[in-house]
Design a protein with these regions (language model features):
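Active-site cofactor/substrate anionic-group-binding motifs, chiefly glycine-
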Residues: 112-137, 142
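Gly/Ser/Thr-rich loops at beta-strand to alpha-helix junctions
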Residues: 114-115, 164-169
């Protein structure tokens, strides 16, 4: 085999170690080159202004007001709708700082649906959203304790209850009401808290599933505003905490915030 080496040519016997080395070097070099091109083209898409800095904190707590926290979420969702690439701080330094403690600015009660990823919807990064998830975004003892922990111990200024378009748990609750459907295992018990919202939404005009999802959100918001422990109620009375509802449109990516106070 004849191989060009710079300006000269070498005759290498077939199967020789030198030939294997040459092939390996060529293949590895090609792979590295392709990787470099891919990496450079990928990172070229990340404009400096797209890198999202973590929300401000002081003494291990968020310094944002409830309205400032909500404004960050609204801004992030608008960027998501515009297909803007927003890169949060994922550096080793950021990870190391979070190992010492977290200071989220929002507690999120949302559905377990895989199509509803809060950090992506709002362009936020590590340690910024304290997320409580279950099918149907309901609040049982475990969820309530998690929310109260986020408020009392972590000092979040905002709690958002997020329902979404075409929620399977709400559809299941509707089938119980309309068809007396039954589900195996613990699913029946899981959707039971959603049934009152389905019943209340039946008389509302418009899409019955969307109405039921929003009514379910409103019921949870009402509980968190009025029927929870003083550790939740006191910061709301002192305007250090807000609890609001939201609805996510799967098809467009838009999040509508409602029942604001």
């Amino acid at each position: 085999l004849r191989v060009n080496a710079g300006h000269s040519a070498l005759d290498l016997p077939t199967g020789s170690l030198a030939l294997k080395f040459t092939r390996r070097t060529f293949i590895n070099g090609a792979m590295l080159g392709a990787g470099a091109i891919f990496a450079s083209s990928s990172f070229a898409k990340v404009a400096p202004e797209s890198v999202v800095k973590p929300a401000p904190t002081k003494d291990g707590k968020s310094t944002l007001t409830p309205d400032e926290a909500l404004a960050l979420l609204v801004e992030g969702n608008h960027a998501f709708l515009r297909d803007e690439l927003r890169v949060p701080d994922l550096s080793a330094a950021r990870r190391l700082s979070l190992a010492a403690g977290q200071a989220p600015f929002c507690a999120y009660v949302t559905c377990s649906d895989s199509r509803v990823p809060p950090e992506l919807l709002f362009g936020r990064g590590l340690g910024e959203l304290f997320i409580i998830r279950n099918a149907g975004n309901t609040v049982d003892t475990v969820a309530m304790g998690s929310i109260e922990y986020a408020v009392a111990e972590l000092g979040v200024p905002l709690v958002v209850v997020l329902g979404h378009e075409a929620c399977g748990a709400v559809k299941a609750a509707m089938s119980v009401v309309e068809k007396n459907a039954r589900f195996p295992g613990a699913i029946d018990n899981m959707i039971e808290p959603i049934i009152p919202a389905v019943l209340e939404a039946r008389s509302q005009p418009g899409d019955p599933i969307e109405n039921a999802v929003k009514q379910n959100v409103r019921r949870v918001v009402e509980v968190l505003r009025k029927e929870s422990d003083p550790i939740m109620l006191r910061p709301q009375q002192e305007n250090r905490l807000k609890v609001i509802g939201a609805y996510y449109h799967l098809d467009s990516g838009r999040v509508d915030f409602f029942d604001r106070v």
